[in-house]
Amino acid sequence: MSDTICISICYCDGGIRLFKSTVRGLNTPPYVKIYVHKTKALLAITPDEERTFTTHKTPRNIYDENGRMVIHSKKLCVALYREMNWDKDKLYRVPGRIMKEGNVAYFDLNKAEALN
């Protein structure tokens, strides 16, 4: 079984925003880790229990009215925009799926939708 979820990627602020449904689909882990498969244009997000050099903390207020989760990584955003030939002046929303069996969120970067 899988559920549809989204992330958005912004070149200008170097941020990857995880929608609340994405964090909820991963069972609100304390930390998440991002993986990119360059040749298949896939981005994966996995839950993690421990803080490491490669994990990102889930905010405690994620489900508050003003709560949000943004992973700031200008280098990753620049690399994604370059690889996907995206317009740097646009924000991209990428639909994905939660694979419950492996508790992994997968995002097909080829299905990104340009906004603004």
What are the functions of these language-model segments?
Residues 1-3, 28, 90-92:
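Residues that act as N-cap/strand-start positions at coil-to-secondary-structure junctions
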Residues 15, 31, 104:
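Beta-strand-rich binding-surface signature
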Residues 6-8, 31-35, 95-97:
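Short, surface-exposed charged micro-motifs
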Residues 17, 35, 44:
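Short, conserved beta-strand segments within well-ordered enzyme catalytic domains
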Residues 15-27, 72-73, 77-78:
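Short beta-strand-centered segments at strand-helix junctions
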Residues 1-13:
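Glycine-rich loop/turn
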Residues 38-39, 44-116:
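Mature exported/compartmentalized surface modules and terminal targeting/interaction regions
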Residues 23-41:
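Acidic (E/D-rich), amphipathic helical modules within compact regulatory domains
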